[in-house]
């Protein structure tokens, strides 16, 4: 965490029978000790979609001026770093999971400052927050509970509540990435 106005959150997604109609997401905020896990269903659910939904939920849930998202998904962090701007300018044509990439773009280039930290495979075991988020996602994916997060409805409701959150361009230029504390993770993306 960089300052008192920044919230750090760990996210993870799981899809035990990849692909399958059911997966789970986990979000953990170490400063509050609060973690949540949600079962998610989608005809196209995969590990990657679950990872993306976990980040979306974290960005929609946290009320902060600045947020750090720790993820062990190279798919999410790499594509947010290297491809999302080009995909958006091309209208997401031919891009798998384009519905979620569009939402992630809108959230990360919106009104709050977002910094993504990629938790590398070697370091995953040393990140307690990553372990908690992983356990929450796996538990939610495997639960027999009937509650399922209706993410499409919630995302639409969130966007409709404040339409300025859609397609708002960053007001400041993107600064250079900063190294994560103690070299425990690799910074992959930091739009402002």
Mark where each language-model region is.
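RNase H catalytic domain
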Residues: 11-20, 37, 57-136, 163
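Conserved phosphate-coordination/catalytic loops
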Residues: 45-50, 94-98
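RNase H-like nuclease fold core
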Residues: 1-49, 60-62, 135, 139-140, ...
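Acidic two-metal-ion nuclease catalytic site recognized across multiple nuclease folds
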Residues: 142-192
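Short secondary-structure junctions and interdomain/linker hinges
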Residues: 111-115, 140-147
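Hydrophobic (often cysteine-bearing) scaffold residues that line and stabilize catalytic clefts
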Residues: 50-51, 129
């Amino acid at each position: 965490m960089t300052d008192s106005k920044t919230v750090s959150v760990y996210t993870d997604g799981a899809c035990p029978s990849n692909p399958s109609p059911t997966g789970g997401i986990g979000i953990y905020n170490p400063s509050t000790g609060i973690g949540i896990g949600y079962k998610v269903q989608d005809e196209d659910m995969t590990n990657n979609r679950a990872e993306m939904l976990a980040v979306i939920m974290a960005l929609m849930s946290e009320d902060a001026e600045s947020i750090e998202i720790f993820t062990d998904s190279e798919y999410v962090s790499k594509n947010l770093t290297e491809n999302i701007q080009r995909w958006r300018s091309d209208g997401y044509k031919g891009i798998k999971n384009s519905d979620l990439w569009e939402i992630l773009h809108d959230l990360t280039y919106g009104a709050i400052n977002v910094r993504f930290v990629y938790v590398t495979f070697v370091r995953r075991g040393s990140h307690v927050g990553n372990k908690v988020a992983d356990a929450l996602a796996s538990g939610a994916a495997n639960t027999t509970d009937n509650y399922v997060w209706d993410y499409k409805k919630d995302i639409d409701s969130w966007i409709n509540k404040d339409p300025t959150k859609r397609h708002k361009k960053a007001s400041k230029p993107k600064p250079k990435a900063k190294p994560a504390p103690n070299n425990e993770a690799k910074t992959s993306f930091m739009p402002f």
